[in-house]
């Protein structure tokens, strides 16, 4: 009798970026009474919940540094490693930079799973690094109760081209590079409800590199950029709004989703992270239907880029995306800060 294939998702209590600590709890963790250390060369720190730290080298070039890791969101070890690495590298692209090196982070239950599984995970990470044009240059591993994988990634960028999530401008249009619904489809798969025709859709989306961010950064009219991951579209949009002292409108009828998403929502395939996200920032969002909440708060793993673009530069950015085979689509717009507590209105 053939051995049953190992299903990595059975060995973890969370999945992908849905493992993230909720924004509300994270705020408590990061709060400190200690005096802040000031470094004038640190261009981007943790004050605005940006995707990575940026350090000015003083010669027109800045270093970008980031880390990201999580537990399995798919069963295949190679795919898990590839997705985790792609997701980590994305933070460099979200700042507009170019990655130059990756360092692996591996936690593995050595008494539960064979070492060959870990080897495949690391190989998946190495494959993604090669796709991004960088070496997997080293790493660190520990024996842990659940499989964990990710990267610490270093990148570079021209200092003047850094795209912060706190530099958006009122009037900018908001665009996305990937459809939403990754958390919903992976939950449907975990529940055994995913239809054959939808197999692999989420994996393909998660493995798509956000390398287009390096090209977007060359357009001055791109005022802010972030990747949409565990806090969902609304969570990461709120970070842009609060960092930039703005409000936003989301056009729900323009949101693109992966095939089958709305059917799976109706079947109850909504990840736990969706509710945690809404509990954290729902009071900052206008009235939502249950379907809108499930889509807009859906935790994305290795999700697309959310880009704020000045209206006169929209066509330029669309053309750049089209040349790269990316279907950029509009999701909303930024406006002056509202006097109410509502940061994002959904229409």
UniProtKB/Swiss-Prot annotation:
Please state what the protein is called. Answer: Selenide, water dikinase
Under PANTHER family, the record lists: INACTIVE SELENIDE, WATER DIKINASE-LIKE PROTEIN-RELATED, SELENIDE, WATER DIKINASE
Q: Where is the active site?
A: 17
This entry's Enzyme Commission designation comes to 2.7.9.3
Q: Which UniProt keywords apply?
A: ATP-binding, Kinase, Magnesium, Metal-binding, Nucleotide-binding, Selenium, Selenocysteine, Transferase
The record's NCBIfam families line, in alphabetical order, gives: PRK00943.1, selD
Give the family, as the similarity comment puts it. Answer: Belongs to the selenophosphate synthase 1 family. Class I subfamily.
| Entry-linked HAMAP family | SelD
Q: What class of enzyme is it?
A: transferase
Q: Name one GO molecular function term.
A: selenide, water dikinase activity
